[in-house]
Design a protein with these regions (language model features):
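Noncatalytic alpha-helical scaffold of FAD-dependent oxidoreductases
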Residues: 1-176
Length: 176
């Protein structure tokens, strides 16, 4: 069995925002999402077997590429999520929700739908192993009057959706 130390997620908008903020090229930043798995152990053969299993599992489920990333670079990108979003938009709404882990893809799709509907960029990072989803809704150059009108509408739809999945608001950390 594999017991990852953590399982993190970043959507493509969050990846590209971190990449611009850090001024560092990240792998496959032009498409897709990141699922960041950290494993640990003191037996190289066991770790190699776990990596092969993870590769097969991810590839079977549609991963573009599975790679052993530079841990410093990939964690720097993940940890910069909030700061990168603040650099992109001083005004934003940081939503902290938690849903069953199996519902994370539905939440990601719903957030993309809501972003398109309301004309805002939403960047997503998640602690995927416990269902905690952070969504930063960026105001950017939207007029303040419009922002103050659309944000509550978007939040109402998001919160209703989260509750419909059995989720909760203020997720730190997890209902898994």
């Amino acid at each position: 069995p594999i017991h990852p130390l953590c399982v993190e997620f970043m959507d493509n908008k969050g990846i590209r925002c971190a990449e611009a903020f850090l001024n560092e090229k990240l792998p496959h930043s032009d498409k897709g999402y990141y699922v960041i798995l950290s494993i640990d152990g003191n037996n190289e053969e066991v770790l190699d077997d776990q990596c092969v299993f993870i590769d097969e599992l991810c590839t079977t489920n549609g991963a573009l590429e599975v790679l052993v990333a530079d841990p410093v670079k990939i964690w720097k990108a993940r940890k910069s999520f909030g700061e990168a979003n603040r650099a992109r938009s001083l005004i934003f709404s940081a939503e902290d929700t938690v849903v069953p882990m199996s519902c994370i893809p539905e939440v990601v799709h719903k957030l993309a739908e809501l972003g398109a509907k309301y004309g805002v960029n939403i960047h997503i990072a998640a602690h995927a192993a416990d269902g905690n989803v952070h969504a930063d809704i960026l105001k950017e150059d939207m007029p303040m009057e419009q922002w103050l009108e659309v944000l509550p509408q978007l939040q109402d739809e998001l919160y209703a959706f989260i509750y419909s999945l059995g989720g909760k608001l203020s997720g730190e950390h997890g209902i898994g």
